Amino acid sequence: MQLNDRALSHKRIKEHLEDGKKFDIVMVNAFLASEAGYYLAKKLDASIVIYSTGQVAIPWVDAALGQPHNPSYMPNPLLESSMEMSFRERLISFVTNAMLQYGFRDFYVLGKVDKLLDKHFPGETRPSLIELERNATLALAFSHPLIQDGWHPVNPNYVHLGMMNCR
């Protein structure tokens, strides 16, 4: 959260916002507390590109792109389970994903990000961060169908970058 606060306080960011400068994209990390970038993209009239360095599908990224994230065949990476999950493992995976996404992330983390945005953009009315997140045009993920999640359906705007080596 402190990194977002420092970024939104930075002189160059403030200048770009005041000048009404337009950008093509704003890249936002998929992990927690980077969601302030969604509102920054709206202010800069830019497309949102979500990137993830995790090797697993993240439920809120899948939700943002409108693609399925089914914990019955996509085990939660924080849990110990096999790819051939039992009913108990599937249930635990489902409950864990729900608590992480809706309890921790959507309620707690996004609440803190909203307070941060209120600090930097006082008095401005804005859509919810979840609504802004649904405007993401692309997701770049350091994942690969052969590791972690395995094969699962993804949209064309979800790009697996895993196992690519840039030299």
Segment roles from a protein language model:
Residues 1-167:
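Nucleotide-sugar-dependent glycosyltransferase catalytic domains
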